[in-house]
Amino acid sequence: MADDFDTGDMFKDPEGFYPPEKEPTFAEHRMLSGQVVRVRLVGSHPLYGNMLWNAGRISSEYIETHAPTLIAGKDVLEIGAAAGVPSIVSAIMGARTTVMTDYPDPDLVDNMRQNADASASMIPTDPPSSLHVTGYKWGSDVEPLKAYLPEESRADGFDVLIMADVVYSHREHGNLVKTMQETLKRQKDAVALVIFTPYEPWLLPQTERFFPLAEQGGFTVTKVFEKLTEKLLFENDPGDERLRRTVFGYELRWKDELR
């Protein structure tokens, strides 16, 4: 009797019903020194790890330009790293420790790890510069991140935080501030770099609400640059073209009374 109701392959999706997964692509970032950082990008991803964003490129240029005082010998944490170019450039420029993180999705973390491995030959060994990769969800426990630091620095935290194109996620602003509070070293020279482009210009007021929230959380906010890029990342998107080409850069530091 059961055989009378055998549907066979009636409900099986036909071949080609689902679009094939996009293959990974590759992108290059040419450093001011002339060195080329080549990174792998995931084929597609809802968390945007498939792009080399303008803020990532400009962050890397800023890091390289200010490396002698900002990066060399320092401990650096990048959150929302995607392909990880700013982390890689930090390691190349002599950071003592660099921890590259993004959402703990296996594809994203594996892609970051491949990029870190591919850049190993560019990273100095004297003095040594270590580059680590791990998944991290904003606002969660930071002790696993601090575990990558040299033992004598774990209680203090990181000298530099890199936050490129993360403040677009408005509902995560509180978690971003929490992560800053728990990872940034409470010293005068410790700094969080917050760099972004308003790809959706009509949402810029919501994006900028991050900064008053950070001030309430104990940080000073200083705008350090506004750079107009040559090309739009998304040419057919709506909104003010000039804003969509502009990268804004801010430095956030602990208020004097909280160091």
Swiss-Prot record:
InterPro entries: EFM7, Methyltransf_16, SAM-dependent_MTases_sf. GO terms for molecular function: N-terminal protein N-methyltransferase activity; protein methyltransferase activity; protein-lysine N-methyltransferase activity. The keyword Metal-binding does not apply. One of its GO terms (cellular component) is cytoplasm. It is found in: Cytoplasm. S-adenosyl-L-methionine binds at residues 53, 80-82, 102, 138, 164. Pfam families: Methyltransf_16 (PF10294). Its EC number is 2.1.1.-. Belongs to the class I-like SAM-binding methyltransferase superfamily. EFM7 family. This is Protein N-terminal and lysine N-methyltransferase efm7. It comes from Emericella nidulans (strain FGSC A4 / ATCC 38163 / CBS 112.46 / NRRL 194 / M139). The gene is efm7.
